[in-house]
Amino acid sequence: MSLFEDLINSKIRELEELKSNLLIDIETRIRKEATAVLNKYSTQITNIESEVALERERILYSAIIEARRKIVETYEQILNDFIETIYNEVDKLRGSERYVKFLRFLIESAINYTQTKDVIIYASPKDRGVVETLAKNLGITGFVIEKDIKGGVIVMTRDGSITVDYSLETLLSNKLEELKHLIYLETHER
């Protein structure tokens, strides 16, 4: 019986070894498949996280650009309102001694620059009478023509070789950067 038992025991050991190897093989396959699935989903999760981060950055960038655009629009509106206020103040001052002195100063400065009193002076229709009186008092031999300007004067030599633009629009335009800076300071001090 020993031979028979040895044979049976040998087969039992083979089956147990096969069973053990089969369990190890199945466990290895399951681990490989699980690792592959985890890697696949980890890659997908990483890609999704990257997409979310990019989308978040795009949304933030768009929001910053939109905020800056609105700030610029607001500053432009403030500047336009400020300039309109200046034009309205000039309209209120027209005919006052202060405004007449201002026009006289502009005309005298332009005459000094052109080095001649034989000039054409362009003025707002609202200022024409005052400018004609000032020109006469200053001994200017040219004439005054109405022009569509908000205030101030434009003085030109008769031959057109020299033009001095002291219109209110040009004076404000020359001060535009300073006005922007002042508005910026006023709005950021609060």
From Swiss-Prot:
Q: Which UniProt keywords apply?
A: ATP synthesis, Cell membrane, Hydrogen ion transport, Ion transport, Membrane, Transport
Location(s), subcellular: Cell membrane
* InterPro entries xrefs: ATPase_E_C, ATPase_V1_Esu
Q: Which Gene3D superfamilies does the annotation name?
A: ATP synthase, E subunit, C-terminal (3.30.2320.30)
A cellular component term (GO) from this record? proton-transporting two-sector ATPase complex, catalytic domain
Keyword Ion transport (UniProt): yes
Tell whether Cell membrane is among the UniProt keywords.
yes
Q: What is its main location?
A: membrane
GO biological process terms on file: proton motive force-driven plasma membrane ATP synthesis
| UniProt membrane topology term | Peripheral membrane protein
GO MF term list: ATP binding; proton-transporting ATP synthase activity, rotational mechanism; proton-transporting ATPase activity, rotational mechanism
Family membership, please give it: Belongs to the V-ATPase E subunit family.
Reported function: Component of the A-type ATP synthase that produces ATP from ADP in the presence of a proton gradient across the membrane.
Q: How does it assemble?
A: Has multiple subunits with at least A(3), B(3), C, D, E, F, H, I and proteolipid K(x).
Protein name (database record): A-type ATP synthase subunit E
Lineage at the top is: Archaea, Thermoproteota, Thermoprotei, Thermoproteales, Thermoproteaceae
Q: From the UniProt record, report the name of the gene that encodes this protein.
A: atpE
